């Protein structure tokens, strides 16, 4: 049964679809599977559909919802510097360029993904990995973020933690 669940998660995720995460065990299996894929399979390239109206790409497909939001970030500014214990989170740069830096908790190795809005891709943030996004361009950075759950200010599952550790 466990192997079937993991196989189903893999098949769904291979199609860039986030599986149903209503069941706590399925959520934990999905987070474990994403952790297994990281960092070799990041960022994940997406298909850019363009015509005379402009361009479109599908960044998030999910079987059970969640919350998406956009942010703008001024040149040189860093957002984040925190980690999550359970939250499934996806970053998609829509316009501009950025470095997404991720560090596994209790490790000092930082993985950096340089991404651009004109080269659509997503980066899923593994649980228990502190992360940040920095606008590395001169223009405003526009980023779409998605989480599998609605934000709850009484239980945010967001713990402050530096990505780049200071050397002593």
Name these PLM-found stretches:
Residues 42, 46-81:
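A short glycine-rich, His/Asp/Glu-containing loop-to-beta-strand
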Residues 77-90, 117-119:
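A short beta-loop-beta micro-motif enriched in histidine and acidic residues
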Residues 104-128, 134, 142:
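Short acidic-glycine-tyrosine-enriched beta hairpin
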Residues 56, 80-82, 100-102, 123-125, ...:
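Short beta-strand His + acidic residue motifs that chelate non-heme Fe in jelly-roll/DSBH
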Residues 86-105:
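Glycine- and acidic-residue-biased ligand/ion/polar-headgroup-sensing regions
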Residues 107-109, 136-168:
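Double-stranded beta-helix
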Residues 1-46:
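Mid/C-terminal beta-alpha module of Rossmann-like enzyme folds, strongest
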């Amino acid at each position: 049964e466990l192997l079937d669940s993991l196989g189903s998660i893999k098949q769904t995720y291979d199609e860039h679809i986030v599986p149903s995460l209503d069941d706590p065990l399925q959520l934990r299996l999905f987070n474990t599977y994403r952790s297994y894929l990281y960092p070799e399979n990041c960022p994940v390239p997406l298909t850019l559909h363009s015509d005379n109206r402009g361009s479109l790409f599908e960044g998030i497909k999910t079987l059970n919802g969640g919350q998406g939001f956009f942010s703008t970030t001024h040149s040189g500014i860093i957002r984040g510097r925190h980690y999550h214990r359970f939250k499934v989170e996806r970053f998609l740069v829509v316009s501009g360029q950025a470095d997404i830096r991720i560090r596994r908790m209790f490790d000092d190795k930082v993985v950096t993904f340089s991404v651009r809005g004109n080269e659509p891709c997503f980066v899923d943030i593994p649980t228990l990995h502190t992360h940040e996004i920095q606008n590395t361009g001169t223009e405003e950075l526009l980023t779409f973020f998605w989480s599998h759950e609605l934000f709850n200010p009484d239980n945010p599952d967001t713990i402050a933690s530096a990505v780049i550790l200071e050397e002593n």
